[in-house]
Amino acid sequence: MDLNERKIVVDLETLSTHSNACIVSIGAVLIENLEIVDTFYTNVNGVDGKKAGLHVEKDTLDWWQEQPKEIRDAWQRDPQPLDTALDSFSNFYGGSGSIWGYGANFDVVILESAYRALGKDIPWKFWDIACLRTLMNVLDKRLPKANNHNALDDATAQANMLLEILKS
């Protein structure tokens, strides 16, 4: 792995745990030359995802209801249409670099499902996908305890962990 290549760490908040979950927020951090150089955050209109056939799960909705109101309110502020959110994320991704999720079968897979649901091209290649959780498990690393469920805050914590690992 080229340590200086672009790396995009992404985190989502969703209304399901399925691979085709409805997205309500996208947070991402861009790393270049082992430094955080940019961030991305957008709330997403969940109704658009549902109309596109993305999954909403009762258990996840119930779980969200148990979270503090300010957490739920955060991703309901100024939601963008799903189409706009994905186009904005594609622009942020920039067409090259690895894309890192915290779990091999969650964030990146769900984003890909959303792109497909709208008939959009996925901006990365399958070989660009990397899993931070797997890397952390191999190295016996743990993320600091947090419970904010904010996609950008979580992506930032994950990016900082990735940098810690890459710099060691």
Language model regions located:
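Short, flexible loop segments at boundaries between secondary-structure elements
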Residues: 123-142
